[in-house]
Amino acid sequence: MKTMTCRELGGSCDLEHHGEDANEVIKAQDRHLRQAVAEGDVDHQTALTEMKGRWKRPVSGLKWYRRVQRDFAALPADAGVR
């Protein structure tokens, strides 16, 4: 299990997302951004818009995805978790 924050994934806060792989934390970030914006949090709107835009621009979106996977792989496992 590893941890990445909203900010590390392009967001505006330090909420921690935990997962066994990068895809799990990306999905958690997606849910977090959508929920925050739905609740009226304008600080997260930019990150949500950028996330949606990645799917419209596959080359830059894939570059972001690969960077997140690389960053996730470089993280140490969470303490106390095997």
Regions inferred by a protein language model and the residue ranges of each:
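Metal-centered catalytic cores of metalloenzymes
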Residues: 1-82
